[in-house]
Amino acid sequence: SVNDPETMAADAINAIQRGYDCLKIKVGVNPKLDIDRLAAVRKAVGDDVCIRIDANTAWEPKEAVRILNGMQEKGLQIELVEQPVKAHDLEGLKYVTENSYVPVLADESVFSPEDAVKIMQMRAADLVNIKLMKCGGLYNALKIVAAAGVYGVEGMVG
């Protein structure tokens, strides 16, 4: 959930105590507050816990790069950012991938094996998220996995 920094830090500690070693945090509405939340969570859980962020298509490409690089400069150690720009803005996605220190995961941009291949050919993302429901089932998911192997792009099922 998206709460104030203190609540999010407490929630993060709770998740770690329950055995989680990687956290996914929604971002995208208020960059300053996002950074404050992430800083509180990072301070609470330490450096050994992975933090991933999901912008849910909230940013414009240049804004995404500025925000993500700012997060890295503050030492927040973000493992990856999920879908920082609009789903169909593959050039924007590529811009973020090429100019950010944070690895980019394409999610909402991947609806089919053809979408995934286009993203991989363009090098528009570092990783692709494969969702069975969204891509049309197991057969299409396996096509995406095969393409990821060919293009050297990491796939994630989620």
Stretches found by the model and what they are:
Residues 14-26:
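Catalytic domains of carbohydrate-active enzymes, especially glycoside hydrolases
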